[in-house]
Amino acid sequence: LECRYIAIEGPAGAGKGTLAARLASRLDAALVLDETDGNPFLGEDHVGRPGSAFQAQLFCLLGRHRQQITLRQGDLFSHATVSDYLFDKDKIYAFQTLDDNELFIYQRLYDLLSREVTQPDLVVFLQAPVEVIRRRRKDRDRRLPELVEAFNHFFFHYTATPLLVVETSQIDLTWPDAALDDLLRQIQQMHGGKQYYVPRNSA
């Protein structure tokens, strides 16, 4: 499988940013990072305010779309590229936070914008149980189990591109050279579809 554009995914705490940076360095590829930090609708002043979840979700969706279009216009995807997010995953958070009326509007906008987004050649989904994610994030958010389950459900049914599911419970998230070499071998052996990979314990 020729992988010029690889997207790394997983819930926060799965280690996607670190892996994306390591892969980009090893492959001499451009690194694309999610730019949705600084969302003005996620501050404490907006928590619980009617419509704030919808505003926050649209901010993320439009920001990711703008970044993707800028990259495509710059012909970045003709070169080796590693991203720490998949545009399609925006829907995971939308279905977690929006009500039915908001989802109806969101879905129509998403359908329009997604047509202009370049699909990766391969998605790598970093998977781990809730208790592992919670320990890594030092997070007591009661919604975390629902979010992790939403990611698992989304990628269980994901068919848009080849998908490599990596079980990360027992690995060193700094991705030392040996672990990265093993992962790259798995990527090179991909022939499309969906495959599961449990790395050797490197923690």
Cite the ranges covered by each PLM segment.
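NTP-dependent small-molecule kinase module
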Residues: 147-203
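Conserved lysine of the Walker
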Residues: 16
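P-loop (Walker A) phosphate-binding loop of NTP-binding proteins
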Residues: 11
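Pre-Walker A (Motif I) flank of P-loop NTPase domains
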Residues: 2-5
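Hydrophobic anchor at the beta1->P-loop junction of P-loop NTPases
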Residues: 8
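A basic- and aromatic-enriched beta-loop-alpha substructure that forms the phosphate/nucleotide-
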Residues: 64-101
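Conserved substrate/cofactor phosphate-moiety recognition/catalytic segment
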Residues: 21, 25-63
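A glycine- and Lys/Arg-enriched "phosphate-lid" helix/loop adjacent to the NTP-binding pocket
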Residues: 90-150
